[in-house]
Design a protein with these regions (language model features):
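Short helix-to-loop capping/linker segments positioned immediately adjacent to catalytic or ligand/cofactor-binding
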Residues: 15-19, 112, 163
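SAM-dependent Rossmann-like transferase core, predominantly class I methyltransferases
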Residues: 45, 55-133, 138-153
Length: 163
């Protein structure tokens, strides 16, 4: 089965399941399974997909068809230029939250301020502020131990120092 065939199969299945972003989701899942950038799928659409990868791709597509969020399947979210690990223990960062970060970064700028991110979850807000406002001292807290571990991992992943 080629990359093109895999994508068409998953797109049809996801579309029939009511997934509005069926094309994007199919591409994300296949690039995740193949461990290649999404753009490479389009460039290499006639490349054969090995049987193990195909089986995994079908499993993940079926999971997505049941409305499991894409970010929970791939454990990944892009947020404000950051690479974040995401799982069921934290909320998926939303575009509206990027707007909040943009405004906070604009206000903080290069000032030496203390910033507290309550209920940090994945740490996306704290990490974005720490990344773009190096003079700020950022602290992130959450009641969930699992969320704190994810936020710590995301801070390391994005090379920022957060307390």
């Amino acid at each position: 089965m080629t990359i093109h065939d895999c994508l068409k199969f998953a797109e049809k299945s996801l579309r029939e399941s009511g997934i509005e972003s069926f094309e994007y989701d199919a591409q994300e899942l296949l690039s995740y399974c193949l461990n290649i950038p999404r753009l490479n799928l389009l460039i290499n659409k006639n490349l054969e997909v090995n049987q193990d990868c195909y089986k995994r791709f079908i499993q993940l597509s079926e999971l997505r068809a049941t409305r499991v969020p894409l970010q929970h399947i791939t454990n990944h979210s892009d947020f404000y230029g950051l690479d974040l690990y995401i799982d069921k223990n934290v909320l998926i960062p939303r575009f509206e939250t990027e707007l909040l970060c943009e405004k906070a970064i604009e206000i903080i700028n290069n000032k030496e301020l203390f910033v507290l991110d309550l209920c940090t979850g994945s740490g996306c807000i704290a990490i974005a502020i720490a990344k773009h406002c190096p003079n700020a001292k950022v602290t992130a807290i959450d009641i969930s131990y699992d969320a704190i571990k994810i936020a710590e991992e995301n801070a390391k992943r994005n090379s920022v120092n957060i307390k």
